[in-house]
Amino acid sequence: MYENIRTLGYVATNYTTKPLNDVLKEIDTYAAWPRVSNDTRLRVDGIFFDETPSTYDPFKYNYLSHASQAVKNGTRFRHHFVVHNPGLIPPALITSPTFAQNSYTNLSDITVIFEEKFDKWLDRSTFDALQSHRIRRSKFAVILHSLPNLSKKVLDFVVEQVQEAADWVFLTDVGTKDEYYHSFSTIFEDFVKSVDGGAEE
């Protein structure tokens, strides 16, 4: 196993409209994989909760707390790793002095603070806010799709700028809706090199 890789099960919460019991059943399905398959190699490290809310609400906090604790307290996950993906946290919220107290970030190891088209990342209000927040970058991820045809030097610069907002990053040039993450993009190899400090062949 590689220490920098986390194998995660996928559970959508539908912004907490999915019945919590259904979410817990899906978590249990992933937890049971090694037993059902009789193969310990199918043990996952945690859960990627997609479609989580971005603005704080006590009911939604309680919902996500139950879901996260099912992973954190379970004995069948290798690292008890929890990721929340609200898709976008409003810039005004993420730069608020009370963000840490009025968010769900204490329930997860990583929160995806921005998942969007590359050109929306370039919007001034978004770019400035995501680079000026004061939360530990190790708690945040940024996912960008629909990148244009960039030179390696420009890609290095883009990765460097994204890493000013988050330690966990993923970039792809795939621009077809519902296909963004179904394959390795043509820039994947260069992207990995850029994350590794812009190393050239």
Language-model features and meaning:
Residues M1-E201:
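Glycan-processing catalytic domains of CAZymes
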